[in-house]
């Protein structure tokens, strides 16, 4: 292991009781506690002369840290990276799509190796499949009073304001759909720090019996959900991949029978598809097994229903209206279509009906990144302020653009030459087609879905919001495509 770095004169001395190892990259001493009588912490003890008789090795569970070789067995029993018992709501691949390997050739031609003719054929298929689709969405750029103070706080920089504007618009759209209210459970997919749920909770004020389930597959620092102390709001964080989440086994939903509102801000690619399946297929199926009518059948048999979104009342079964549905609504900001996957995609039937399959989907998802590639180039060449450009860089860092982004300087890497504007239009068509499959899926499941722009592209290049509510006759007029 690397020997302890020499102490920099400007750094001073290590804190008493702390490790004496100087971290060159951070220009400071390690802040870990050293054992009594030792100069270094366990991680850096191998560098010290007094500890060189004991060998440290990489932990086999997580090579990001080391452990004494003679204490490996003991360490493996308590290592934070050890596999933990699966919770009751974990069911392997319950929200995954059907695996059909026969539809995808073993070796697809890399996108960069496509001939000019192959690329032209793909673009022709894309344009034919997109005929009749509305290539632009309605503007639903909104805000909400709950974020007024934060949006006008001078201490918030451009990056923070950018995210606050998006959260405010999502919150405004949730309210417009009449999904803000008491006695329900908000499930935030890809929750991260939980800030979207945080603002929903603030907007609800003193609403009774509100639960929040925050789903995130990785450990997250600086979470905000742990700071809430309202007696009528309960926050629960589930560290699990959405692909394996069985919502009807989560205790609060199993026992409380609260209607669910699925929300998410920038739910990347495949995560959107497994989240939709988690909500409208896996979760709804648990109620159908209890001899409750499927949503689509209830809508067909109830043409006179005027209430678009009735809340489940707390109490006995007799208090629950006949039109109660497990999923009250869905509001998800989409992004990263290049991270979609044919196996998990919910719009397979839509693609097949258009004569398209896994191969076309494979290439369309990669070309979808051109939508924001073209916009980024035009922004860089415009009079956009440096602050706005920094915000765009931050957005690109938050959501990886994938390996198929093309800038203006390397258009010749494609078979034939496509201008930035042409790539941008093609990318948008790819996104539109993928999203259209999701809309059809939701319609078939008894929902009235829609796509809308929820924020300005200068705030976020990924500015499309997917919303859906149960398609009762009265809601179909208000929530059209």
UniProtKB/Swiss-Prot annotation:
It is an enzyme of class 2 (transferase). One of its GO terms (molecular function) is tRNA 2'-O-methyltransferase activity. Zn(2+) binds at residues 59, 65, 75, 79. Keywords: Coiled coil, Metal-binding, Methyltransferase, S-adenosyl-L-methionine, Transferase, tRNA processing, Zinc, Zinc-finger. PROSITE patterns: ZF_CHHC_U11_48K. GO terms for biological process: tRNA methylation. InterPro entries: Methyltransferase_TRM13, Trm13, TRM13/UPF0224_CHHC_Znf_dom, Znf_CCCH-type_TRM13. It catalyses: cytidine(4) in tRNA(Pro) + S-adenosyl-L-methionine = 2'-O-methylcytidine(4) in tRNA(Pro) + S-adenosyl-L-homocysteine + H(+); cytidine(4) in tRNA(Gly)(GCC) + S-adenosyl-L-methionine = 2'-O-methylcytidine(4) in tRNA(Gly)(GCC) + S-adenosyl-L-homocysteine + H(+); adenosine(4) in tRNA(His) + S-adenosyl-L-methionine = 2'-O-methyladenosine(4) in tRNA(His) + S-adenosyl-L-homocysteine + H(+). This is tRNA:m(4)X modification enzyme TRM13 homolog.
């Amino acid at each position: 292991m690397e020997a302890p770095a020499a102490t920099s004169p400007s750094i001073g001395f290590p804190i008493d009781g702390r490790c004496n190892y100087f971290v060159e990259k951070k220009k400071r001493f390690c802040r870990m506690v050293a054992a009594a009588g030792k100069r270094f912490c366990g991680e850096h003890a191998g560098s010290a002369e007094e500890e060189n008789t004991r060998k440290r090795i990489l932990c086999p569970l997580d090579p990001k840290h080391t452990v004494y070789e003679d204490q490996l067995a003991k360490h493996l029993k308590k290592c934070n990276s050890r596999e933990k018992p699966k919770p009751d709501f974990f069911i392997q691949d319950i929200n995954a799509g059907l695996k059909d390997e026969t539809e995808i050739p073993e070796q697809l031609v890399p996108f960069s190796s496509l001939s000019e003719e192959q690329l032209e054929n793909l673009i022709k298929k894309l344009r034919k499949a997109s005929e009749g689709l509305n290539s632009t969405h309605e503007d639903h750029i909104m805000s909400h009073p709950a974020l007024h103070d934060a949006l006008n706080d001078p201490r918030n920089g451009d990056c923070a304001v950018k995210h606050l504007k998006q959260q405010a618009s999502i919150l405004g759209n949730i309210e417009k759909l009449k999904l803000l209210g008491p006695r329900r459970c908000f499930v935030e997919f890809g929750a991260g720090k939980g800030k979207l749920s945080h603002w929903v909770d603030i907007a609800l004020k003193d609403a009774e019996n509100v639960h929040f389930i925050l789903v995130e597959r990785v450990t997250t620092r600086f979470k905000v959900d742990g700071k809430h102390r309202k007696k009528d709001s309960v926050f629960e964080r589930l560290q699990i991949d959405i692909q394996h989440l069985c919502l009807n086994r989560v205790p609060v939903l199993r026992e409380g029978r609260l209607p669910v509102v699925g929300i998410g801000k920038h739910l990347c690619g495949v995560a959107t598809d497994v989240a939709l399946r988690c909500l409208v297929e896996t979760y709804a199926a648990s109620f159908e097994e209890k001899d409750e009518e499927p949503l689509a059948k209830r809508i067909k048999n109830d043409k006179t229903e005027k209430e678009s979104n009735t809340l489940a009342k707390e109490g006995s079964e007799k208090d629950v209206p006949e039109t109660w549905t497990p999923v009250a609504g869905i509001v998800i900001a989409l992004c990263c279509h290049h991270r979609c996957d044919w196996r998990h995609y919910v719009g397979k039937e839509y693609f097949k009906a258009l004569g398209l399959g896994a191969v076309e989907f494979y290439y369309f998802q990669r070309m979808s990144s051109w939508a924001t590639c073209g916009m980024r180039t035009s922004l860089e060449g415009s009079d956009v302020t440096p602050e706005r450009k920094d915000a765009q860089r931050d957005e690109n860092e938050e959501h990886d653009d994938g390996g198929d982004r093309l800038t203006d300087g390397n258009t010749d890497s494609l078979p034939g030459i496509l201008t930035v504007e042409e790539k941008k239009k093609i990318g948008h068509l790819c996104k539109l087609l993928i999203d259209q499959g999701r809309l059809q899926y939701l319609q078939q499941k008894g929902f009235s879905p829609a796509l809308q722009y929820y924020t300005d592209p200068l705030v976020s290049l990924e500015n499309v919001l997917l919303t859906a509510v149960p398609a009762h006759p009265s809601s179909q007029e208000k929530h059209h495509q």
